[in-house]
Each structure stands twice: as structure tokens, then as C-alpha cells.
Amino acid sequence: MITIYGKANCGFCTKAKSFADQREFTYEYKDVGMSKDTLNELMDRAPVQVKSVPQIFIGNEYIGGYNEFTKYVEETGYNGTGETL
């Protein structure tokens, strides 16, 4: 399962969701601007200091932002099921 942490009015967050939608990936979107608990969850999960959104995980694997997400999908052939092609 893909988890996208983002916030309102974030262009790259919108692009990450659109990228996932176009590929019919199932994902959970968590708005860090709506809940301090969600922001704290992201800070606890990320292996780096979070300075921007989106921050994306596939399962428990930290991917990074939008550019890292698209690169990961293209390079690994990830198909949204947790498997690669």
C-alpha cells in the first residue's frame, strides 16, 4: 500500500496523487495540515528530517518526494501491488 503524506495547495502533492491515479495504484492520502497527529506520524516514520511534502512510502519503505516516487516506479516497474514487473 502506498501512503502519500501531503497538504492542501501543494502542487507536488497533487501531482503525486495524479501519478498514482493514472496508474490505478491504491493509496492512502494523509493531510499533515489537518492533524498534528498525522504530522507527528510522518516525522516518526521518515528516516530523514522532513522539510517538505509530499513524503511517500510504499509499505514500510520510504521513497521520498514526487520525483523520487516517479523515478522509483519507472526504474523498478512497480505496478501498485507491491511487486515489480
Language model region names:
Residues 1, 9, 43, 68-74:
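Catalytic phosphate/metal-binding cores of nucleic-acid and nucleotide-processing enzymes, i.e., regions
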Residues 1-28:
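Local sequence-structure signature of Cys/Sec-based thiol-disulfide redox active-site neighborhoods
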Residues 11, 37, 64:
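Short alpha-helical
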Residues 14, 18, 40, 71:
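Alpha-helical elements of the RecA-like P-loop NTPase motor core of helicases
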Residues 26-40:
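Thiol-based oxidoreductase modules, predominantly thioredoxin-like and allied folds used
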Residues 41-46, 77:
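Short amphipathic alpha-helix with an adjacent loop that forms part of the alpha/beta core around
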Residues 46-56, 66-67:
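Structural micro-motif
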Residues 58-85:
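Non-catalytic, surface beta->alpha helical segment in thiol-disulfide oxidoreductase systems
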